């Protein structure tokens, strides 16, 4: 099992999290096993993160399909400075920080 991590500006996280919970509850996120959200607790990061957990981390095409589905269904617009989303798994070795990546075509002037 692994997870897609989608960062959001902290000022939008509550609104997005509410929407994600509704979609999950109504089975609108196929094959998503569970979801988690970073807390609103103060931290040094300007972004919060929503995690989407999926099985089949060895099937790159399927996992990337799930990642693209999240981008489409959530109409994902990344925060400024974010140019990709990452799929992480416990099976990733010490030499690598993520298993898969989806590059986002974004113009930082249009983000946030």
Each model region followed by its residue ranges:
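Extended amphipathic alpha-helical regions
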Residues: 1-112
